[in-house]
Amino acid sequence: SKEEVEDLTSNIILLSYLLGKRLGINYKDIDSSLQDKIKLNLIEDHKIEKWYGDLSELLEFLISR
């Protein structure tokens, strides 16, 4: 169901942030690295962006929060 997918996805994101913290990376640096990775994929014209526009949408979301 949609709720189960949302729950699993949010758990993956949560655990990624917590693992990063345990490895000495602060949350802000994780966000910054994520934005840099998205920008690089935009420059490299990643297929997911061509097909769906997901990368630019995600970058806008991250910048706006």
PLM feature segments, named:
Residues S1-T9, I13-R65:
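Flexible "arm" and connector segments at domain edges
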